[in-house]
Amino acid sequence: MVQSRNMEIRVNARKSDAFDIFNIKHYQGANPYLETGALVFNFTLTGYEEPLEIEEYLQIIGEFYPQMLYVEGGYNSYAQLFARTVAEVGQLDMGLHLDKWSCKQGEDEAIIAVQSLHARTSKSVVYFVWDWFEAMTQKQKIVFDEQIRVIQDMFRRSAYGGPTVYALLRTAAVKGIPTFYLWDEGLMQYGYGKKQVRGIATTFDSDSHIDSDFTTRKDDCKAFLNTLGFPVPTGSIVLTRDEAIYVAKSIGYPVAVKPVVGHKGIGVTADVQDAEELKAAFSRAIKAIPDDQPTRVIVEKSVSGADFRLLCVNGRFVAAMERRPAWVEGDGRLSIDELIERENRTKARRDTPTSALSKIQRDEAMELYLEEQGLSLDSVIEKGQTVYLRKVANLSAGGVSMDATHSVHPDNIVLAQDIAQHFRLTCLGIDAIAQSLSNSWKDGGFGILEINSAPGIFMHLNPATGESVDVPSRILETFFASDSDAKIPLITFNNIAVEELEAIIDYILLQHPDWTIGAVCKERVFINRAEKNLNKDYNSNVQNLLRNPKLDLLIAEYQGNILEREGMFYTGSNIVILDNPTETEMMLARNMAEEAILVTKESNSISIKRQGLIEQYALGENEPFSRVYLKEIATIL
């Protein structure tokens, strides 16, 4: 499939194309081309269409990515320019940490590797950049912003695209904590073997599922908080609209209405003033209840004030946020609907995993609230007039987050921590209404609305207003004080026979009989000496071993053909043992832990690199290589 520019048959290119891309391959981890997950592909000229000069492409690209104009030494080839462009576009204008790339130029073609997290998104980026280069060649324009939005949305819908998931994943990468997605389970794993933690967003396997379920039973939870002496609004659970009207009349308007089981403020209506509003609010609450849940709605006294979220991690207060409903400001010319559309086009509301604001959502609740104000989506409001679009400060519907961490009264911090310490949950969000968090809850005017066992955290990391609070770090530091706390010993060979692998397992178990050792080579998979199923996908075997929550140590073989085909699942080996390695297998020596030991055998010559020093000697006649590497393995046990 290697194509030169003079061959007539291309792999993917059309007759009008100047460039061709083929042999696209996605690696989940380190590979021969890049030390991270990557999309790798071949790039060449077709010979059909004469390309522009490199500088002409660069000037157009520089209008969108001016940082590309200032590269020392410039770009030596079309492939190099293409690779850098893919890397820039691949960050999707939302600061993704996917900025690594490489370009290996051959005689007729280049092999390009760009850092990748989600294969489908990365492929879309490559094809978009290819279309862009062809359009520039033909002196045509493309709808750049629209194409970027489509790819942004693709990433946002991926397993990595949720704001909380991405914030934790990126922070783990910075801290050197190994992280990978478990597709069959729909969970993220942080760390290896017995050091691992698994979870999704801010819910982790160490959390009590009983406590987590309890937080969704808003009525019981409220009763529990009341027994602790904390301020909760009075109210009742109702099953019918007539019951709702009766309860509201009993406790007095205004009231708040919300489903017993719900999240993200969906179906919640605050400040309901009369029976007519109550009927509409009750209907919205009913619609928000999942099909598999009973029809139960809370009607409670509405507390006046601002909407706040207090966040605790591991029982400790870490952040607070004020949440305000979305609003628009009139210009005397545009309708409210047009003002919303204009606001939704702003950079801050791109609704990506790294944007501070979501898009403003139009729905029945918005239209009813506008109607209460004597307005509609078609209304044109005066210049400078501010109109709030809903009663509830729902961030997922376009609400605005404002950091309040440093203004919280000490009594309110104690309240949050007292509540959090009654639950075995890593993260706990406490939603409250108050005039200000700077006033003690003991002075009145403070009501706890509900608690949340899976709170979103990106709003604290990137609030619309105020200082950032690095909540992802606080969460990960709950489990891992440093990156070493997330790792088990990893021993990597480029070539090892089954008998030698079994001998190493026995050697380690003699010293640590209570350990669980995982081992894999091209022929077998072991847990201790018990043989396990060998998956045809080699890295699935490695992942399954590292997924084992009892695993103390991993031994893995990575031959060159496996590295070329699948790449390497993990990095950070503690010992790498190379027996007459190929050029490809030498990548194992590049992906070691900082204090790792490298043992290399070339013919009869031995080289051992440890702690910056190199020891070299020749094997004695009939001296086995195992005598060399077993001594080194002993140093990490």
Stretches with model-predicted labels:
Residues M1-T171, R316, R324-D331, S335, ...:
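ATP-dependent carboxylate activation and anion-phosphoryl transfer catalytic cores
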Residues N12-R14, V197-D363, P410, P472:
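Active-site nucleotide/adenylate-binding loops and adjacent lid/helix of ATP-dependent enzymes
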Residues A113-S250, H263, E499-E500:
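Conserved N-proximal alpha/beta basic substrate-recognition cap immediately N-terminal to
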Residues G191, V247-K249, L311, N439-D443, ...:
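Short glycine-biased active-site loop of nucleotidyltransferases that positions the nucleotide triphosphate
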Residues V238-A244, Q435, G560-L563:
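Short acidic loop-to-helix transition motifs that present clustered carboxylates
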Residues L339-G399:
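Extended, charge-rich helix/loop segments that form flexible
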Residues I488-L510:
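Glycine-rich phosphate-binding P-loop
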Residues D506-L637:
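ATP-dependent carboxylate-amine ligase catalytic core
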